[in-house]
Amino acid sequence: MAAYQQEEQMQLPRADAIRSRLIDTFSLIEHLQGLSQAVPRHTIRELLDPSRQKKLVLGDQHQLVRFSIKPQRIEQISHAQRLLSRLHVRCSQRPPLSLWAGWVLECPLFKNFIIFLVFLNTIILMVEIELLESTNTKLWPLKLTLEVAAWFILLIFILEILLKWLSNFSVFWKSAWNVFDFVVTMLSLLPEVVVLVGVTGQSVWLQLLRICRVLRSLKLLAQFRQIQIIILVLVRALKSMTFLLMLLLIFFYIFAVTGVYVFSEYTRSPRQDLEYHVFFSDLPNSLVTVFILFTLDHWYALLQDVWKVPEVSRIFSSIYFILWLLLGSIIFRSIIVAMMVTNFQNIRKELNEEMARREVQLKADMFKRQIIQRRKNMSHEALTSSHSKIEDSSRGASQQRESLDLSEVSEVESNYGATEEDLITSASKTEETLSKKREYQSSSCVSSTSSSYSSSSESRFSESIGRLDWETLVHENLPGLMEMDQDDRVWPRDSLFRYFELLEKLQYNLEERKKLQEFAVQALMNLEDK
């Protein structure tokens, strides 16, 4: 009994499909036999709808209901669903705090609130910078309000990190964006702590700490997926250019060191009209100068300034500038631009292919749903039309039988003058013939119905009914049915019902086997978690 109740509680698509097939089959048999007068016009979804349930129940409490089978597919398993499948969560009386923290973090309202705070923090920093040097005492309440708002925003950011830790501490540190968010939040917390402690001064470190408050705007990178994709594309492009950048840095170093030696006379020249005499004074300045030449910024003015010193050879200086312009500014920069464009095109092509694949899959799913819905509509229309035609044919047959009975009764009345024994024998013969005809018609109707339903679909059956009249079809196939081999038999109703019942139980057994396998997998996962 418990197993039967458990089977009733479970909702299996395959078992429901078999049960729906059983109901449709026996409903058709009953209609062909004239035992039922109603067809399934409503589905389970319509019956469970509160707005229509009362109306359907008041209309006909004994009407049949058509099952609509729609499988449910889980596209992506969330962290909350994984957490709910854990053994200690299922066995505990109350849900853990990690489940609540994950629900808060996944809430769209909380995400939008964090994004709003990031933009609000940017506006507050802009206003604070404008009011930083102001000595007006009337603006002190505004400054205090901005300071309180900055502290409130910082506390909300810290609370967000604590919720992520509470949700899953190990997964938090595996995500690069979470680590980036943590570093930005902690760096923006340092100037607030310094101000709270009371450290004052104008040192460089304090100024850098104050600048760190601006880093809170970088939290937008961890909030928007589109910005993350752009950054990932840039990182991927830079990875593909690793060796090219290494080669470029080597040439930077070579030309910087060469410039220090080649233009040493220019650097030590006593002329007062030299504008760029410190550009090659040491290695750092030489590296900056090489980078300026790499960008083609006033390179000719620098060359003209070098030519003012007669100790520097014009040939070597010209070769130095032209060679670096050819290698760095023309060749290397063109290669870098070409590689960046190629990488972006490849990434764009991959994204387009992925989007096209998803669109094709979506169109295929929509096409499948349309085909399934069309088949359901066609089968429903064919079934209703066949029922209506069968009812019409049964009515015509009943009228013919009534006319036949009336004619026979009239014949009996006309022969009323016969003897009493002849009358009794004729009445008994007429009753026997009528009963045989009725039994024969009902048996032929059931056998032809079961055989035609098992051999062909409902659509073909409805088409064959539409082409021929029922009485004509029976009379044409009557000799063939009489000459049919006795071994070729159709299933009885009880055997057919038992067959569908066993198929339904088989689906429940398969589902139970599947769940046992899932429990074994979850047990192994719980052992690994411990």
Curated annotation (Swiss-Prot):
Source domain of life is Eukaryota
What the record says about activity regulation is:
The CatSper calcium channel is indirectly activated by extracellular progesterone and prostaglandins following the sequence: progesterone > PGF1-alpha = PGE1 > PGA1 > PGE2 >> PGD2. The CatSper calcium channel is directly inhibited by endocannabinoid 2-arachidonoylglycerol (2AG). Indirect activation by progesterone takes place via the following mechanism: progesterone binds and activates the acylglycerol lipase ABHD2, which in turn mediates hydrolysis of 2AG inhibitor, relieving inhibition of the CatSper channel.
Q: Name a biological process GO annotation.
A: flagellated sperm motility
NADP listed as a keyword: no
What are the subcellular locations of this protein? Cell projection, Cilium, Flagellum membrane
Pfam families documented for this protein: Ion_trans (PF00520)
What is the documented function of this protein?
Answer: Pore-forming subunit of the CatSper complex, a sperm-specific voltage-gated calcium channel, that plays a central role in calcium-dependent physiological responses essential for successful fertilization, such as sperm hyperactivation, acrosome reaction and chemotaxis towards the oocyte.
Q: What is this protein called?
A: Cation channel sperm-associated protein 2
Q: Please give the organism.
A: Homo sapiens
Gene designation per UniProt: CATSPER2
